[in-house]
Amino acid sequence: MPQIGTVIRRTKNFYYVDIGESEPRLCHIRANLFHRNPKKNLVAVGDQVEIDTADADKAGWILKMLPRRTRLSRRQSADSSEQVLVSNADIVLVVASIRSPPFRNGLVDRFFVAGSCGGLKTVLILSKADLSTEEEIASIKNLYLSLG
């Protein structure tokens, strides 16, 4: 009988799906889902999926994916297609050093844009404040607060 679960881990050929048991269920993806677009990462961590778990001693099968609420994705460099890194999350926590290594606002900005495009709330956490001046902290804080 099919069950609904959440993908909690992905390896090259397997997905680990939490269906409320003590251990996650090891699953394969059905060929008909894979052949729709074999180059694309169809199932991501966080996806809600319907799985067939008929035989408790064997790996299950992912039958279909349920619609995503949110996603954090990036463009794959080879063909510019979207690669979903995580789905159905509520928040993205971006941890960035103020110093050592220096703050990289371009990188932080990309996370904010990716989170916003995927429907996620994004929060910036600044680390290594003890190595920074009050002015450096205030400058970064004021910049991102002014952006919303």
Residue ranges and their predicted role:
Residues 1-105:
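N-terminal accessory targeting/assembly segments
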Residues 46, 115, 127:
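Residue-level signal for inorganic ion chemistry
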Residues 88-91, 118-122, 147-148:
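Short glycine-/polar-rich loops that comprise or flank the Walker A/P-loop
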Residues 94, 124-126:
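Structural beta-sheet core signal
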Residues 98, 128-129:
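Conserved Walker B
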Residues 104-107, 136-137:
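Residues at alpha-helix caps and immediate loop-helix transition turns in enzyme cores, especially N-
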Residues 106-119:
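Histidine-anchored nucleotide/phosphate-binding helix
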Residues 121, 130-148:
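Canonical P-loop GTPase G-domain recognition
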